[in-house]
């Protein structure tokens, strides 16, 4: 029996929107869930992308460090210029851009369309709090 070999170029950018203080485990679970649901390999992740206010977000920073992923962050002024399929007025009201996950993924990947539109992940465990929004774009 021959072993199967799969090669994955690191060309997927994962846009992440999350509440302040979300744990590394919660963010990791959200990414794993979305990748599993869409039959994508996490080995193809180039990095995570978010709004610049998350540049020191412990959960994001820890996950990127452990996985050896890049973390790109962008100011709201840039993210709000990105055309996204699912803008949110609620998000716009709070952080001055209608999108974080979708806009950050698109901007990081330097592309115009998403591989996976925003997916909102909430933990199944009642004691674990937080919400993570994930979107995925593929760089060329």
Model-flagged regions — what are they?
Residues 1-54, 137-140:
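Conserved mixed alpha/beta catalytic, RNA-binding, or beta-rich assembly cores of soluble enzyme
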Residues 28, 32, 61, 100-104:
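Predominant activation on well-ordered alpha-helical scaffold segments within soluble catalytic domains
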